[in-house]
Design a protein with these regions (language model features):
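Membrane topogenic/interface segments and analogous intrinsically disordered interaction regions
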Residues: 1-258
Length: 258
């Protein structure tokens, strides 16, 4: 009896260590993918940052410039932006490593669901960032700049502050555009019935405005630009989730007849 328990404990320990080593290897491969892309892009770091800052630069008055208040800011900020771009480009590899690690523990029907979820999640995240870059940034910056002229103030933004603002906004809109995926997963896995998600629609709308008030600048325009898409994407998720409502088992289907 003791020998059997010892053998079982030894097997569990070996299994845990093998999973731990595999996780380490997957993390290393994902990190290497990001580093390789970063090294390939680092030469163009100033150009990447200029493109990154273009929405703000275009809103500045003629001759307006961004400023640097930190001695190392002009070097590290473009590097951070380039690292962000490298992460986005390498994200499919990162997702694949995550998928390869968890796939052996999933059922067949769960594996079939993972691939479309990963592809749609990545696509929607990129669309969310593009929405922020091409629509939200120009709209907000021009709106803010219009208030400076009557005050006789000149808008000169520090590049480090701009980086923090832009990354927070990118993350907020990227996650916001994941709402349809979250809704579909909740319905498909049977965690929340579709009818319940429809029932809590008013609370979701209120929550969207609360979240937008927290993560966006304190102006109504920015909050609307986040809250309205979040609400519409929730509705889109409800529509798509209708296709993924789990079918009742034979026993559940036959129970009313009993």
């Amino acid at each position: 009896m003791t020998d059997n328990n010892a053998t079982e404990d030894s097997g569990l320990q070996e299994s845990f260590l093998s999973h731990l080593f595999e996780l380490r290897d997957r993390v290393i491969k994902a990190a290497l993918a990001i580093i390789i892309v970063f090294v390939c892009l680092v030469y163009w770091a100033p150009d990447i940052f200029h493109l990154f800052a273009q929405p703000l630069l275009s809103a500045l008055p003629a001759g307006g410039k961004m400023i640097v208040t930190d001695v190392t800011g002009s070097f590290f900020v473009p590097m951070k932006v380039t690292m962000l771009v490298a992460f986005i480009i390498a994200l499919p590899v990162v997702m694949y490593q995550l998928w390869a690690f968890i796939a052996p523990g999933l059922y067949l029907h769960e594996r079939k669901l993972i691939l479309p979820l990963v592809v749609s999640s990545y696509t929607l995240f990129i669309i969310g960032m593009a929405f922020a870059y091409f629509l939200v940034f120009p709209t907000v910056f021009k709106f803010m700049a219009s208030y400076n002229a009557p005050l006789g103030a000149e808008m000169s933004t520090d590049i480090d502050n701009y980086l923090s603002f832009a990354m927070t906004t990118f993350l907020a809109f990227g996650i916001t555009f994941e709402v349809p995926v979250v809704v579909v997963v909740l319905v498909r896995m049977g965690m929340v019935p579709l009818a319940k998600l429809r029932e809590i629609r008013p609370y979701v709308i209120v929550g969207a405005f609360v979240i937008s008030a927290i993560v966006t600048p304190p102006d109504v325009l920015s909050q609307l630009l986040l809250a309205v898409p979040m609400t519409l994407l929730y509705e889109l998720g409800l529509l798509v989730a209708r296709l993924y409502v789990p079918k009742p088992s034979e026993d559940e289907a036959a129970s009313p007849a009993d």
